[in-house]
Amino acid sequence: MMLSRAKPAVGRGVQPTDKKKKKGRKIPKLEELLSKRDFTGAITLLEFKRHVGEEEEDTNLWIGYCAFHLGDYKRALEEYENATKEENCNSEVWVNLACTYFFLGMYKQAEAAGFKASKSRLQNRLLFHLAHKFNDEKKLMSFHQNLQDVTEDQLSLASIHYMRSHYQEAIDIYKRILLDNREYLALNVYVALCYYKLDYYDVSQEVLAVYLQQIPDSTIALNLKACNHFRLYNGRAAEAELKSLMDNASSSFEFAKELIRHNLVVFRGGEGALQVLPPLVDVIPEARLNLVIYYLRQDDVQEAYNLIKDLEPTTPQEYILKGVVNAALGQEMGSRDHMKIAQQFFQLVGGSASECDTIPGRQCMASCFFLLKQFDDVLIYLNSFKSYFYNDDIFNFNYAQAKAATGNTSEGEEAFLLIQSEKMKNDYIYLSWLARCYIMNKKPRLAWELYLKMETSGESFSLLQLIANDCYKMGQFYYSAKAFDVLERLDPNPEYWEGKRGACVGIFQMIVAGREPKETLREVLHLLRSTGNTQVEYMIRIMKKWAKENRVPI
């Protein structure tokens, strides 16, 4: 939800005016326009005077100042650069130039210009923010110590807290300033944004309402309101909130259009992602992350990895996403290195003081222990927020696996059956774990039916092996024999005949003991006859003899 800092918010063209309306109207003074924050009018006046030869002192600096406040940073840059080339250039020009470089994302140039300026609170604030951009903790602390207890410096400190994910610290500063300056309405938006980042979406809405009562058409506030609706309700509700913005966003607010296009992709579940997000990757920070998420949802793990591999994570969200991508790539490639990186990222977030008691933090710890195959620990964390994810397919998928892995196949089966996603239900991991749960819960027929619904493939062959072996271990010899029979026909491996022979003997013993219907013997004989092994005739002869003695029709 950051603004575009690389594109001018206002073009250079002066809007044509009606000369008749202007006739007789007094030309306003520059001071009047600046006091009203009419920067467009001020630039128009300054350019007019420049054109007719009535240029005032420092005209280029005033044009640069107005362009900067309109978001036309390229125009401001041009004016300030020209000013620095003049003789006896005021040293304050350098700090203004540095601020312009900063908003254009040209941080090295901003630092160089900043050090040419005379020492001032503005210079210190600028260098403070640049130290954050460069991840230079030593310089950051040095400039931090120079901050004073004045509004501008405290707002700068709050901004750094926000960017370092220290949202509560930022809120404390904003609230303290608001106590003495109720007229600083925009601070309510900053407070609301911090609460949004802390996942307190309802509180964010309440704080935001204070600002929207006074400024109902604010682009940033309406966008944040839409984001809150997305989190509290759904994408449709969020999109409805953005409608007025889409209708009213003027050409002078290009960043608003970029922001709206980006958020609509998110609200619509990724629709149009490949058309909208790539050009915004270096404009809106979240665009890269959301494009990575899109690729993951499309199972294009390699593209997701290519997009995020060079990103140096600084926020919990970035650490989490890098962890997810590395885990997915590790599973796809069978790479232990990627799995270890993922586990470390998850542990870093889940173990941090700021995230350990949040749901994302606990999800990270669950993921960390999942990768370490410590499923008892996985369940401790999953159970701590289970009530929030009752109908969430991904949660139920992980919860079911953890339950089954710890031997609680009854609850594992129950969780697997809650899953609604057809894509997930056709995944081999889902099918194999559910089959195992069915077998352990003495429902081998349901496991066999899972196999029958599958098309012939390597995965169906693997499921057959699982059914054959697990049913054998559980004494469910009938379905074990059926599975080994199919395996033997698909691959004449002696091991499959041995498994089938043992399963058939097991069924026969259960029939003799009265624990299996006598009618099953007919099918056992049919399974044995499909094998060309020399041992078959001896086994069939014994079974037939018993059937004859016990009057069992075969």
Curated annotation (Swiss-Prot):
Q: Where in the cell is it found?
A: Cell projection, Cilium
Its chief place of residence is other
Q: Which segments carry the region annotation Disordered?
A: 1-26
Is the Glycoprotein keyword given for this protein? no
Q: Where are the TPR repeats?
A: 57-90, 92-125, 151-184, 468-501
Task: Say which family it is in.
Answer: Belongs to the IFT56 family.
What is this protein's name?
A: Intraflagellar transport protein 56
Please tell me the species this chain comes from.
Macaca fascicularis
Q: What is the lineage of its organism?
A: Eukaryota, Metazoa, Chordata, Craniata, Vertebrata
Q: Which gene encodes it?
A: IFT56
